[in-house]
Swiss-Prot record:
Keyword entries, A-Z: Cytoplasm, Cytoskeleton, Phosphoprotein
Entry keyword annotation includes GTP-binding: no
Keyword Endoplasmic reticulum: no
Top-level taxon in the UniProt lineage: Eukaryota
Designated name of the protein: Centrosomal protein of 76 kDa
Alphabetized Gene3D superfamilies for the sequence: 3.10.620.30
Subunit and interaction comment: Interacts with CCP110 and CEP97.
Entry's localization field: Cytoplasm, Cytoskeleton, Microtubule organizing center, Centrosome; Cytoplasm, Cytoskeleton, Microtubule organizing center, Centrosome, Centriole
GO terms, biological process: regulation of centriole replication
Species this chain originates from: Homo sapiens
GO CC annotation: centriole; centrosome; cytosol; protein-containing complex
Gene encoding the protein: CEP76
Family under the similarity heading: Belongs to the CEP76 family.
Residue positions, PTM Phosphoserine: 75, 83
Length: 659
């Protein structure tokens, strides 16, 4: 529903007043602090956490608190990015939902209280009510918890005002049900990973910044409250350039019975940094020695793509094995092939580079890749390998080249029977590898490879790294017996474990869990279909043609679209016979039927329509001339985790042939 600008402005003001009356942040402070601390008499303030909980249970206060502790959070925080998102207007009231908080657990309340010095947006005009504009969204991950801020208009001083309640707990040693004390929390080295995403007016996403927040300074602050100024740096080639500043406030709930001295906190952090630096130094020394030995096998190895380290979005060199980890998708993905389809529908985009030259290297951390919903081939391969490892397969990322020597990464799985399967993460295609023998006589028939890969330099996963030391690095002649050290030179698994195992170093970004889609497939399918009908009608009107839609014919296209997606997910074709039979019955004798299916991984109808018109066959259908022309279009959106989606569109027409 569109509103006049004056009405939209009035509605926006009323919403703002109502949210101010609710005082969300104040309610969090008052209920937790007063209920848990001030309800006890002053002489009992020395009680331990266990005694405090027992006293609250005896008095029945916990039951009351569980009923009363309802905090209002914006449901947009729980949404995940998609590619692309619908443009955002700022004259609509957000949907609010309530969340319960357990007063027996320890929480870190992180507030983002505005931003400043985002100088790239210095001249950005303030958006008018109802105007579509570019937005910033802040995504957070901490110990398997993910959050997302409300989108705010891009500005020099973006109006971030969000609060995130992060549960702090130990997940092992039987401490999962105990409230963490200061000493326990000091030993939890996981940082808070913050990713800033920009979404333009067309729904395209850009990674602006990726920052790891060290939150434990709050443990040495008075009353467990501290304020920080976080300077966000750019990504890739701009990783040394400041993009903006965020004002952040950290509070512990319930308040700490005992705060640590700042000196103790600083000493712990310094010790962790020192241990991490020493482990990384020792691994670097080992990697150099391994590389020297690899070159001594054959000097030509120097030209092979043996990738031991790779730069992340912040320009930090990390061992490639740290980009992969067994990842379980819970109930979001059922099979390895469905996982491959999910990775395939995430957008592909090479890292941006300023000026000409070669490819810019940027292997994104998993959170940055998921929040942006697109990345390079290495990002896709790392995610697919992690998911396949989670399904119990022996999976590796392969680094090599495609045709014309273009660097590329893909995934390989090794079966228990020795079968080697390549998985192309950008398309979801699978290829069986059967090596050719270069010593066979020319007359011998050799299997022709169907895969697009030409050379392979190394393979790796979270535990192993192996360099290809066979006489030729051509994939078609490669033997993938990874236990044969005459063909594959391994790195020490202990050395890899020292820097890549979970918790081995504090510099390792933790892996976030996948989140379910927030897209309503039926609603989105219908919206895109209606937009395409309008675009087709306008296009035909410009050509002087009338448009008559046939709803029944449109409906009959649905089984075909479902069949196409099923085939992409399972590699099995099904249901085509019923579709063809239905179409034959729907098209009268003497009439001609034409259909054009096409697949996208974005939900922008206008962009999809422009792409379709570039196909001569599709243009022939859309611009069909003849007797009794009836047009049909069907859209089917298939949703996947992280709000990724596969969009299938089929245009069709039937007309009476006049010759």
């Amino acid at each position: 529903m569109s509103l006049p600008p004056e009405k939209a402005s009035e509605l926006k003001q009323l919403i703002h007043q109502q949210l101010s009356k609710m005082d969300v942040h104040g309610r969090i402070r008052e209920i937790l602090a007063e209920t848990i601390r001030e309800e006890l008499a002053p002489d009992q303030q020395h009680l331990s956490t266990e005694d405090l909980i027992k006293a609250l249970r005896r008095r029945g206060i916990i039951d009351d608190v569980m009923k009363e502790l309802n905090f209002v959070t914006d449901s947009v925080e729980q949404e995940l990015p998609s590619s692309p998102k619908q443009p955002i207007c700022f004259d609509r009231q957000s949907t609010l939902k309530k969340t319960n908080i357990d007063p027996t657990r320890r929480y870190l309340y992180l507030q983002v209280l505005g931003g400043k010095a985002f100088l790239e947006h210095l001249q950005e005009p303030e958006p008018l009510p109802g105007q579509v504009c570019s937005t910033f969204t802040l995504c957070l991950h901490y110990r398997n918890q993910r959050f997302r801020s409300k989108p705010v208009p891009c500005a020099c001083e973006p109006d971030f005002h969000d609060g995130f309640l992060l549960e702090v707990h130990r997940e092992s040693l039987g401490d999962g049900t105990r409230m963490a004390d200061s000493t326990t929390m000091l030993s939890i080295s996981d940082p808070i990973h913050m990713v800033l995403i920009k979404t333009d007016i067309f729904g395209e996403t850009t990674l602006v910044a990726s920052y790891f927040l060290e939150w434990r300074s709050v443990l040495g602050s008075e009353n467990g409250v501290t304020s920080l100024t976080v300077e966000l740096m750019g990504v890739g080639t701009e990783s040394k350039v400041s993009v903006g500043i965020l004002n952040i406030k950290l509070e512990m709930y319930p308040p700490l019975n005992q705060t640590l001295s700042q000196e103790v906190v600083n000493t712990q952090l310094a010790l962790e940094r020192q241990k991490t630096a020493e482990k990384e130094r020792l691994f670097l020394v080992y990697a150099k020695q391994w590389w020297r030995e690899y070159l001594q096998i054959r000097p030509s190895h120097n030209s092979r793509l043996v990738k031991i380290f790779a730069q992340d979005e912040n320009g930090i060199n990390r061992p490639v094995c740290s980009y992969v980890k067994p990842l379980r998708a819970g109930r979001l993905l059922d099979t390895p092939r469905q996982a491959a389809r999910f990775v395939n529908v995430l957008g592909y985009e090479r890292a941006p580079v300023i000026g000409g030259g070669g490819k810019q290297e940027q292997w994104c951390t998993l959170l940055a890749f998921l929040c942006r919903n697109k990345g390079d081939c290495e990002d896709h391969a790392n995610l697919l390998c992690s998911l396949l490892l989670g399904y119990g397969l022996e999976a590796f990322v392969c680094v090599g080249t495609k045709a014309k020597g273009v660097p590329h990464a893909w995934v390989m799985t090794c079966g228990t029977d020795g079968a080697i399967t390549f998985w192309e993460s950008l398309t979801g295609h699978r290829y069986i590898h059967k090596p050719t023998n270069p010593d066979e006589p020319p007359v011998a028939e050799q299997p022709k490879p169907l895969y697009p890969y030409r050379t392979i330099g190394c393979v790796f996963n979270h535990q192993m790294f192996l360099g290809n030391c066979q006489p030729s690095d051509a994939v078609e002649t490669c033997v993938f017996d990874l236990n044969d050290e005459s063909k594959w030179k391994p790195m020490s698994e202990e050395a890899i474990k020292s820097v890549c195992a979970p918790g081995a170093t504090t510099s390792l970004p933790p892996f976030p869990p996948l989140c379910a889609s927030t897209i309503d497939a039926s609603v989105t399918s219908n919206e895109i279909e209606m937009q395409l009908r309008l675009l087709v009608s306008e296009h035909r009107k410009d050509l002087g043609l009338t448009t008559v839609w046939e709803d029944q014919l449109s409906y009959l296209l649905s089984p075909a679209l479902a069949s196409y997606e099923f085939e992409r997910t399972t590699s099995i074709s099904a249901g085509n016979e019923e579709f063809q039979d239905a179409i034959r019955r729907a098209v009268p004798d003497g009439h001609t039927f034409k259909g054009f299916p096409i697949h996208f991984v974005y939900r922008n109808a206008r962009r999809a329509f422009a792409t379709c018109l570039r196909s001569p066959f599709c243009e022939e259908i859309i611009c069909c001339r003849g007797d009794q022309v009836r047009l049909a279009v069907r859209v089917r959106v298939f949703t996947y985790p992280e709000s990724a989606c596969a969009v299938w569109i089929m245009f069709a027409c039937k007309y009476r042939s006049v010759l």
